[in-house]
Design a protein with these regions (language model features):
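Single conserved hydrophobic/aromatic residue that forms the stacking wall/gate
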Residues: 1-10, 218-227
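Secondary-structure capping and boundary motifs in well-ordered enzyme cores
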Residues: 19-24, 44, 52, 81-88, ...
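Extended, charge-enriched "interface" segments that sit outside catalytic cores
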Residues: 36-39, 49-125, 130
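Short, residue-level hotspots on alpha-helical faces of the histone-fold
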Residues: 30, 50-54, 58, 62, ...
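N-terminal-proximal low-complexity accessory segments that begin disordered
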Residues: 13-56
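Flexible loop/turn segments at secondary-structure boundaries
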Residues: 55-56, 130-133, 179-180, 195-196
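His/Asp/Glu-rich acidic catalytic environments and adjacent acidic regulatory segments
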Residues: 20, 141-217, 221, 225
Length: 227
């Protein structure tokens, strides 16, 4: 074969190409590696971790959604790397699960403990609070969060509600008040009008915060009781 013919064979062969979507996942892995680098300042590592999460949200909104549309339309043409939309989705399912597992591992096994060593405690359970702090958290929920929570039940007469992109939502099993009927599924959107980070007044040099979704989870029975 001539040089030009060899170049044409390489250009037309899928084995010489990487799928665009899988390449993006590899890019997010490289960003995540920055969050895992112990030589980088702690808050910079947290920033890199948050970037990977934000990237993943946008990736699903645009690229994964586009692949799903093509699959639903019966589109079977292969991309330059030789993969159909369905094959790409299957490969992404594996690759993204690995990425998310690594995200959680980085946060829970490394960054979270470093935050605590530096005096920043992220509260996830009511039992982690002192009596005084618990009173503050309960009051904050009743005065600021509860008024803007709206549980939306899902049943045969009420289809699954439209979930906004990048919104935080909680799934809950609810039952009508004073009823023995079966539990029903409901969604509760975490209010976007409030700060996601709630600082808890505490004594000493430590700083305690609770995320709005965790605060809502702790009190989730309150808005669902009257249903």
């Amino acid at each position: 074969l001539s040089r030009r013919q060899r170049q044409m064979c390489i250009r037309d062969s899928p084995k010489y190409y990487t799928n665009r979507e899988l390449s993006w996942v590899l890019f997010d892995h490289r960003v995540l590696n920055e969050a895992r680098d112990k030589n980088i300042p702690l808050f910079e590592r947290l920033k890199f971790l948050s970037i990977t999460a934000s990237n993943l949200d946008e990736f699903f909104m645009i690229r994964v959604a586009s692949l799903k549309d093509m699959e639903n339309a019966g589109y079977t043409k292969k991309d330059i790397a030789g993969m159909t939309p369905t094959e790409q989705l299957k490969a992404l399912h594996v690759a993204i699960h690995e990425l998310v597992d690594l995200q959680y591992s980085t946060y829970n096994r490394s960054l979270l403990s470093l935050l605590e060593k530096n005096g920043l405690h992220i509260i996830r359970e009511h039992e982690q609070l002192t009596a005084e702090e618990a009173v503050y958290v309960d009051q904050y929920f009743q005065e600021n969060v509860y008024p803007v929570l709206t549980p939306m039940a899902v049943d045969s007469s009420r289809p699954f509600p439209l979930i906004r992109n990048k919104s935080l939502n909680i799934g809950a099993m609810v039952r009508k008040k004073n009823s023995d009927e079966e539990l029903e599924f409901a969604t509760v959107q975490v209010p976007s009008v409030l700060s996601r980070v709630v600082r808890i007044p505490s004594k000493g040099k430590t700083c305690k915060i609770i995320l709005l979704e965790e605060l809502s989870l702790i009190h989730i029975s309150e808005p669902t009781r009257p249903y």
